[in-house]
Curated annotation (Swiss-Prot):
Belongs to the universal ribosomal protein uL6 family. The lineage of its organism: Bacteria, Pseudomonadati, Pseudomonadota, Gammaproteobacteria, Vibrionales. This is Large ribosomal subunit protein uL6. Part of the 50S ribosomal subunit. GO terms for molecular function: rRNA binding; structural constituent of ribosome. It comes from the Bacteria. The keyword Lipid metabolism does not apply. This protein binds to the 23S rRNA, and is important in its secondary structure. It is located near the subunit interface in the base of the L7/L12 stalk, and near the tRNA binding site of the peptidyltransferase center. GO terms for biological process: cytoplasmic translation. It comes from Vibrio atlanticus (strain LGP32). PROSITE patterns: RIBOSOMAL_L6_1.
Amino acid sequence: MSRVAKAPVAIPAGVEVKLNGQEVTVKGSKGELTRVLNSAVVIAQEENNLTFGPKEGVTNAWAQAGTARALVNNMVVGVTEGFTKKLTLKGVGYRAAMKGNAVGLTLGFSHPVEHALPEGIKAECPSQTEIVITGCDKQVVGQVAADIRSYRAPEPYKGKGVRYADENVRTKEAKKK
């Protein structure tokens, strides 16, 4: 059994947490996040800690409590520090540039690709082959990075495409005659 739910979530100074039934709202310097948690989870606030536990008589309540604890912890980290995903472009002529509230990509198609950014997400291009995505919601930051990567995922022969900065693309050997 996982013991994630047994550890409380510490609420740092400058972070405000509101509990309204199963709805948790976390407000900090980077923004505000709200999430409705599963009904099988009991949430309690004790001074600067949030504790999670299972509701009696529910089969997978401990699993749901662990999930809820991880989600709320990510919310607290997001509103204090934020989350960042870095993408790199590899390939001849592959470029990225900011166009207002969208990322403009040149990825070898007959047309340029523009990816509009959702609210609360910021992106910057330190160079033509790098994109840095930041925001306070871990799920949305990861989804935007995955959407941009999906336009041209790294291919296995030369490794050309959009990849995460920490991603290791295994390349294959070309077919021999």
